[in-house]
């Protein structure tokens, strides 16, 4: 999958 930060951005 992909990793997102707490703001939901890549």
Curated annotation (Swiss-Prot):
Primary localisation category: secreted
Recorded GO CC terms: extracellular region
Domain of life the protein comes from: Eukaryota
Keywords: Cell wall, Secreted
Subcellular location: Secreted, Primary cell wall
Biological role: This protein is present in the macrocyst primary wall which is produced by amoebae during the onset of sexual reproduction.
Protein name: Surface protein P34
Species: Dictyostelium mucoroides
Gene that encodes the chain: P34
